[in-house]
């Protein structure tokens, strides 16, 4: 074996030289130089510096402006809340452990950080699934006389949390476990060992199939059909120009969010699955650290994309930051005309046969 397995950890280095120590008790500078841990700490500080205000303002602006509280935005608000939770409960811990070069909070802290990192990532994934299904229902109209409203949005939010908890909770109760990964400063699901006494192999397979592959299949199907429907509607002029424009804008925003999610999480999923399928193979700590820390940036890009691509939300954000007055002239009064087109007509539109 090219790694060293302990009671609650796995170090990606053989202990033939006798230098391997518990990541809960000793600095792991034999895995990487101290300056590399400093880079990880600086990166986490940057994510906190950006992630906290961005997600907080997303929540605050949505609560402040009634016209933003539409069914579609419930899922986006849920996403911002989960990201905010990740920043406060996960990133701060990882920043502190990176500064010390090992996971100073012990096994309990590892379970705490691993749980919230997994929960936040899964809420983001299932939120994108809910958004894809909502877009598919509204734009593709698979059901006649169906109106997507507040109750459906709340059900979608509840669904994201149920599915995320179904992935993040089992390791807390003995089906798999959370252990330090990579350079041993952050924690995640144990992809490194089979660990039959905790049925680790079955959990990893369950996680990849149910909580990664199936969501991606649903998202791919929904947006594949959606793109075809939007093109057909544009060619046949079946809907008004304003409705088509609103649907295209919201659809573009969500598709970009999905693309960025894949950019952030697919490398991590690929590396984790590779390690799992090649038990005992040789790999350095950086091999898992880079995709794991890169995946954490997902807590920032979704609200940024939403602010950049949604004119109504952008105007509300500027109005809030400028104490109730938009210096660019697109304040609440001037944007009222576009409110229905960009939000209400898309998220709560009556779906009827074409």
UniProtKB/Swiss-Prot annotation:
Region (Disordered): 332-354
InterPro entries: GPCR_opsins (IPR050125), GPCR_Rhodpsn (IPR000276), GPCR_Rhodpsn_7TM (IPR017452), Opsin (IPR001760), Retinal_BS (IPR027430), Rhodopsin (IPR000732), Rhodopsin_N (IPR019477)
Protein name: Rhodopsin
Native species: Rana temporaria
Cytoplasmic side: 62-73, 134-152, 225-252, 309-354
S-palmitoyl cysteine lipid attachment residues: 322-323
Gene3D superfamilies reported for this sequence: Rhodopsin 7-helix transmembrane proteins
Modifications after synthesis and translation: Contains one covalently linked retinal chromophore. Upon light absorption, the covalently bound 11-cis-retinal is converted to all-trans-retinal. After hydrolysis of the Schiff base and release of the covalently bound all-trans-retinal, active rhodopsin is regenerated by binding of a fresh molecule of 11-cis-retinal.
Signal peptide: none
């Amino acid at each position: 074996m090219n790694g060293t397995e302990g009671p609650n950890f796995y170090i990606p280095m053989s202990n033939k030289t006798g230098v391997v120590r518990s990541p809960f008790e000793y600095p792991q500078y034999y895995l990487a130089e101290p300056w590399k841990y400093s880079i990880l700490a600086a990166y986490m500080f940057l994510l906190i510096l950006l992630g906290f205000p961005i997600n907080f303002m997303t929540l605050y602006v949505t609560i402040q402006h009634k016209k933003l509280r539409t069914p579609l935005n419930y899922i986006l608000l849920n996403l911002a809340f989960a990201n905010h939770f990740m920043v406060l409960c996960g990133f701060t811990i990882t920043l502190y452990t990176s500064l010390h070069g090992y996971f100073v909070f012990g096994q309990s802290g590892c379970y705490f950080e691993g749980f919230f990192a997994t929960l936040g990532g899964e809420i983001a994934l299932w939120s994108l699934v809910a958004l894809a299904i909502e877009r598919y229902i509204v734009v593709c109209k698979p059901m006649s006389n169906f109106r997507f409203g507040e109750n459906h949005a709340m059900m979608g939010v509840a669904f994201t949390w149920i599915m995320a908890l179904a992935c993040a909770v089992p390791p807390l109760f003995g089906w798999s476990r959370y252990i330090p990964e990579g350079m041993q400063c952050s924690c995640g699901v144990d992809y490194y060992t089979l660990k039959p006494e905790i049925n680790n192999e079955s959990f990893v397979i369950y996680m990849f199939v149910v909580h990664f592959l199936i969501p991606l299949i649903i998202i791919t199907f929904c947006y594949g059909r959606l793109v075809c429907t939007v093109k057909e509607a544009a060619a046949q002029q079946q809907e008004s120009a304003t409705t088509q424009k609103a649907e295209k804008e919201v659809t573009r925003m969500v598709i970009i969010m999905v693309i960025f999610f894949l950019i952030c999480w697919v490398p991590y999923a690929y590396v984790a699955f590779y390690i799992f399928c090649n038990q005992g193979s040789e790999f350095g700590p950086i091999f898992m650290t880079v995709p794991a820390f890169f995946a954490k940036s997902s807590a920032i890009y979704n609200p940024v994309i939403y602010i950049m691509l949604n004119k109504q939300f952008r105007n509300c954000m500027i109005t809030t930051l400028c104490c109730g007055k938009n210096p660019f002239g697109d304040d609440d009064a001037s944007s009222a005309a576009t409110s229905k087109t960009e939000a209400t007509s898309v998220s709560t539109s009556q779906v009827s046969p074409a």
